[in-house]
Regions:
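Catalytic and substrate-binding clefts that recognize carbohydrates or anionic sugar/phosphate headgroups
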Residues: 1-165, 175-177, 181, 188-193, ...
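Short, hydrophobic/amphipathic alpha-helical packing segments
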Residues: 73-75, 90-93, 185, 293, ...
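N-terminal small/glycine-rich loop or linker at the start of catalytic domains
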Residues: 157-174, 271-284
Length: 558
């Protein structure tokens, strides 16, 4: 255990906090209510009176600007690809924020893995309220002379950030729709022909046999191990996706082993939860169960033995297309609607029923984990699921390939996962507003230790344009994770497909010229618990400039 400086941190406990793994330091508990805050025991809500010049920033991967004042943010990892500035929850939950008015500054970290609502001057312009759905909370107050000092102290509290291999700072091309080895060869050849550097090609779900984790479709990817070697001779690493759901199929080894050993999440009656994602019906591994976590992590060996050195974990909020139980309820309700005349209100009720199938909140209350010897309902620890899936893989890599650095990043996350992998910001869209969102998210992610991070360059959903892609690449040059990714059915957006091919080549060449500097600064930020990308206002200490400098960053350290 590392020991932080207690004079800078005070820890308050409410209810029965879970040992989430977010914190690596030992902090003595302080009795009472957090300084500066008022606590309403009836509603389990903490209140802070905002001063006129208070700015609030942090909360990691969230919408809107760097100054979070004026909106509601809910830490509740959600599979929501059609997100905009009106959303309250995205794929990640990182409950660290700083309040600063230029004279008084402090930080707050709420270690609570359930849903937490931060109302930052939305309901009442002068009040910051923090409401955990279940108040089993470790509440940390962090003091310091400046925001940067508070960030460094917080980062000491949560531990050093993940460092990927150096090649992971190169340019990566991805698309949901590369279905065969031939498709991937075509992409590699397209970049090679134009002399555009390329280090990674990502493999989405189509490489799998029937969307089953840790399988290869032998017809689409014959002799996979030699194909991996072939790509490496071209200087390209293949990076496959791994999803959270395990297909229910007799004879499928991952399913059979998980079922036989009780490694899947269970309902209250002890039966394995049946949900659905890409393969159809699936079980979810119980990553919070240490034995199940070790088992799943060992499965990555199938791919590392074939020469794979990088992965991205997806669908690990977990996303749920439906559960078997809820689908039965919906079908029963639909039958009732068949007997009714759907007036305006009946029609809206019908739409609500049908629209409630995917990612239904009740479904997240249907299953349980074995967590530190306790049976815990999922919704109380929901935000840990993606964290513990990535932890499972990372800890396994230390055993199955101890001499290699493995690229690992995830869609869902919680504070603490930054020690095991990076993040991408999920399924964005080809919109100028989403480029802006990418720019504005980076400081919050860095504050929470997620230094290896980035967005889908050009946008995942929708059809990008050449000018949007050009501007996004220009920004992406400076983000550690630099990946162009798009969805099935959208415009193909490999850089060689656009008219201004030479301009794109020059931009990617600039990125490669900067990699030694970027990597050095990244390592410094990890070692010194600093931000790799920080707003200029944080660097200068002039927080009043934060409103005017929403997209200006500083990356030099001494």
């Amino acid at each position: 255990m590392e020991y932080a400086h207690n004079k800078y941190i005070k820890k308050y406990e409410f209810g029965n906090p879970y040992d989430t793994g977010a914190v690596v330091a030992c902090i003595d508990k302080t009795a009472g209510i957090p300084e500066r805050f008022r606590f309403d025991a009836k509603t389990d809500t903490f209140f802070y009176t905002l001063k006129e010049k208070d700015m609030v920033f942090g909360l990691g991967e969230t919408v809107r600007g760097i100054n979070k004042r004026g909106w509601i943010y809910v830490s509740n990892n959600s599979d929501d690809p059609v997100h905009d500035e009106n959303k309250t929850s995205l794929y990640a939950s990182q409950n660290f924020l700083i309040v600063d008015n230029g004279k008084d500054v402090f930080g707050v970290f709420l270690d609570n893995p359930g849903s937490v609502t931060f109302d930052i001057g939305y309901t009442d312009a002068n009040v910051l309220s923090i409401h955990p759905e279940y108040n089993d909370t470790s509440f940390y107050v962090i003091e310091g002379a400046s925001p940067l000092e508070i960030i460094r102290t917080f980062r000491e509290l949560i531990g050093k950030s993940y460092i990927p291999p150096m090649w992971a700072f190169g340019y990566g091309q991805s698309r949901w729709g590369y279905k065969t080895a031939g498709d991937i060869r075509e992409v590699a050849a397209g970049y090679k022909e134009l002399g555009i550097p390329l280090d990674m090609i990502y493999m989405d779900i189509d490489y799998m046999q029937d969307f089953k984790d840790f399988t290869i479709n032998p017809e689409r990817f014959p002799d996979f191990e030699n194909f991996v070697k072939e790509m490496k001779t071209e200087g390209i690493h293949l990076v496959p996706i791994i999803d959270a759901g395990v297909k229910i199929e007799e004879g499928y080894d991952v399913y059979e082993e998980g079922k036989a050993n009780g490694y899947f999440c269970k309902k209250e009656n002890g039966e394995d939860l049946v949900a659905a994602v890409w393969p159809g019906k699936v079980h979810f591994p119980d990553f919070l169960n240490e034995e199940a976590s070790r088992w799943f992590g060992e499965k990555y060996k199938v791919l590392t033995d074939a020469g794979i050195e990088g992965f991205w974990n997806d669908m690990n909020e977990p996303a749920i297309f439906y559960t078997e139980d809820h689908l039965k309820e919906v079908f029963a309700q639909v039958k009732e609607f068949e007997q009714k005349e759907l007036d305006i209100w009946g029609f809206f009720d019908f739409k609500d029923v049908v629209g409630s199938i995917a990612n239904n909140p009740e479904d997240y209350r249907r299953f349980y984990h074995e967590f530190h010897g306790q049976k815990v309902r999922h919704d109380r620890v929901h935000n840990l699921y993606g964290f513990y899936m990535t932890k499972s893989a990372s800890e396994s890599f230390e055993k199955i390939c101890p001499d290699k650095k493995i690229l690992m990043f995830s869609r869902a996350s919680y504070t603490g996962m930054h020690r095991y992998g990076g993040v991408w910001t999920g399924d964005n869209c080809s919109r100028w507003s989403h480029l802006l969102m990418n720019i504005q998210m980076m400081p919050g992610l860095n504050m929470n230790g997620f230094l290896y991070s980035g967005a889908d360059i050009g946008g995942f959903g929708g059809n990008t344009t050449e000018d949007l892609m050009m501007r996004w690449v220009e920004f992406g040059i400076f983000t550690p994770l630099f990946r162009n990714h798009s969805a099935l059915g959208t415009r193909e957006q490999e850089l060689y497909r656009f008219d201004r091919k030479e301009d794109f080549r020059h931009l990617i060449e600039l990125r490669y010229a900067l990699i030694p500097y970027i990597y050095e600064e990244f390592i410094k930020a990890v070692e010194h618990n600093e931000m790799y990308m920080m707003p200029l206002s944080l660097y200068t200490g002039k927080m009043s400039a934060a409103v005017r400098s929403k997209t200006s960053y500083w990356q030099e350290r001494h």
